[in-house]
Amino acid sequence: MMSKEDIKQEFKEMEGDPHIKHKRKHLHQEMVMHGAVASARKATVLVTNPTHLAIAIYYQPDETPLPRVLAKGEGALAEQMMKAAREAGVPVMQNIPLARALMATAAADQYIPSELIEPVAEVLRLVRKMAANPESQP
C-alpha cells in the first residue's frame, strides 16, 4: 500500500508540481493581459458594453479586407483595455448588443463573423465621421 507521501510524489510526477503549474498559469494570464491592452492601443475602435466587455477592432481598408478583432476582454481586463485605448486616442464606442455579439461569436486575431459585418461597418462609419468632423463631437 502506498503512503500519502508516495501518492503525492506520484501525482507530482504525473501532473507536474502544483506550484510550478500555478506560476506558469499566472505568467500566461499576464502575457494575455499585456497583449490585449497593447491591442487596444492599436485598434481603430474599441466596442464596449460600458464596463464589463471590450473588443478591440482594427480596420484599414488598404491593409485588411475586413475588420479584425484584435483582442477581447472582460471585467478588469476590459477596464484596462478601455483606459489604454483612451490614452492612445482610440475611439471607445458603447454598443451593448454589438459588444455582446462580438464577445460570443468573434475570436481574437480573426476577421469579424459575417453576420456582424453590417453592425461593425456602422460603428466604423460613425468613427470615420467623427474623425472627419471633430467639432461636432459631444
Predicted regions and their residues:
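N-terminal cationic and glycine-rich segments that engage phosphates or anionic surfaces
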Residues: 1-82, 88, 92-104, 108-138
